[in-house]
UniProtKB/Swiss-Prot annotation:
It is found in: Cell inner membrane. One of its GO terms (cellular component) is membrane. PANTHER family: BYPASS OF STOP CODON PROTEIN 6, INNER MEMBRANE PROTEIN YBJJ. Residues 1-11, 72-77, 127-138, 188-207, 276-281, 328-339, 390-402 are cytoplasmic. This is Inner membrane protein YbjJ. It is a multi-pass membrane protein. Pfam families: MFS_1. It comes from Escherichia coli (strain K12).
Length: 402
């Protein structure tokens, strides 16, 4: 293969990954922006809605726990193709559940979507980390930026369809159908074999240290837990938080969610430059503090204008947590699929615990007060941000040789 053909193949591979990050964001936002309507159709309380969302958490955790084995057994290409296809099936189940007004079936649909999305996300990130190493530059934040761009597009469509009175059932089904062609076109650019038969590192980290004794990896897990909680709580609860906590209309609640996704998108598309310029530690710490400021203003200030600005800060603050911790995890040793899975699993604990916890607290104390938990975790992430530091050159060379 010539240099030009290799470069072109890498470029096509990168754009395919952009699509595979964009599409899950679009699908996620397609139902997340309709949560007020979904709650009304299913006739559930806030606490019961938290229980329904628990299906997403269970599915996501199940998928991500299997992801490292799947990637090492079948390779990223096959895992991405199958799991992304199953995610579309999950969306179709959501539409059917709304048509049947079945909270249980909706939770099952979220479980299918979550399991597919969880497995796909690890495979996509492993593929993205491989591309990042080949390009020798920071690109994972931009890839995650396409996820945020997808959520922004989905939020915009959701706002428009809500304003025009299009039923959530129809909206979610259309989103699933739109996703079919991009999956089967983009997968052609992904090479076969990435991550397949990777070294077995499920029990030990660098230099034979068990994962549960790898202090840096554990602290990276704390960072991703906090930042994923901040991101996930907005994805699950922000429209309802604005409708019930600040008195916005459902359409305005979708608009506010679009502001959050705008902040996420801008942060991820610009994050690579800041990381290369200032270091991962500085960027994680600044992001966490910015997110804490935005969340704090939403909790303590009763102003529509302030809420609109604050969700952008929230989005900017949460934007780089996941991609940076994925990059940091891949630095700790040679077994990228397992290490990415360990950190991603920790992050998904936030998605597992978050919806029911915030739903329970919101039912008893109000959603604004429930967000104090998110605020505390984001501040903790700023404190332990040093864990995401890049290894020195000698350590990095030793890991690459291994």
């Amino acid at each position: 293969m010539t240099v030009n053909s290799s470069r072109n193949a890498l470029k096509r591979r990168t754009w395919a990954l952009f699509m595979f990050f964009f599409l899950p964001g679009l699908l996620m936002a397609s139902w997340a922006t309709r949560t007020p309507a979904i709650r009304d159709i299913l006739s559930v309380s806030i606490a019961e809605m938290g229980g329904v969302l628990f299906g997403l958490s269970i599915g996501s955790m199940s998928g991500i726990l299997c992801s490292a084995w799947l990637v090492k057994r079948f390779g990223t290409r096959n895992v991405i193709l199958v799991t992304m296809s199953c995610a579309l099936i999950g969306m179709m189940i959501l539409s059917l559940a709304l048509w049947l007004t079945s909270p249980l079936l909706f939770a099952v649909g979220l479980g299918v979507f979550g399991a597919s999305f969880g497995s796909a996300e690890v495979a996509i990130n492993v593929e993205g980390a491989a591309v990042e190493r080949e390009m020798n530059k920071t690109v994972l934040p931009m890839m995650h930026g396409f996820y945020s761009l997808g959520t922004l597009a989905g939020a915009g469509v959701g706002m428009a369809l809500t304003a025009f009175g299009v039923p959530a059932t129809v909206h979610i089904l259309l989103a699933a159908l739109v996703g079919i062609a991009p999956i089967y076109i983009a997968i052609q650019a992904i090479p076969d074999g990435t991550g397949k038969n990777a070294a077995d590192g499920t029990q030990h980290g660098e230099k034979g240290v068990p994962f549960y004794r790898d202090i840096q990896l554990l602290l990276i897990g704390v960072v991703v837990l906090a930042m994923a909680f901040a991101e996930g709580s907005a994805n699950d609860w922000l429209p309802l938080l604005m409708v019930d906590g600040h008195g916005f209309s459902p359409t305005s609640g979708s608009l506010i969610y679009a502001g959050f996704t705008l902040g996420m998108t801008v942060g991820r598309f610009t994050g690579g430059w800041f990381i290369d310029r200032y270091s991962r530690v500085a960027v994680v710490r600044a992001s966490a503090l910015m997110g804490a400021l935005g969340i704090g203003l939403i909790i303590f200030v009763d102003s529509a204008w302030v809420a609109g600005v604050s969700v952008v800060l929230w989005g900017l603050g949460a934007s780089l947590g996941f991609p940076l911790t994925i990059s940091a995890a891949s630095d700790t040793g040679p077994d990228a699929p397992t290490r990415v899975s360990v950190v991603a699993t920790t992050g998904y604990l936030a998605f597992l615990v978050g919806p029911p916890l915030l739903g329970y607290l919101g039912e008893h104390y109000g959603l604004r007060s429930a967000m104090l938990v998110v605020l505390a975790l984001v501040i903790l992430a700023a404190i332990v941000a040093k864990a995401v530091a890049k290894p020195d050159t000698k350590t990095q060379t030793a890991m690459e040789n291994s």
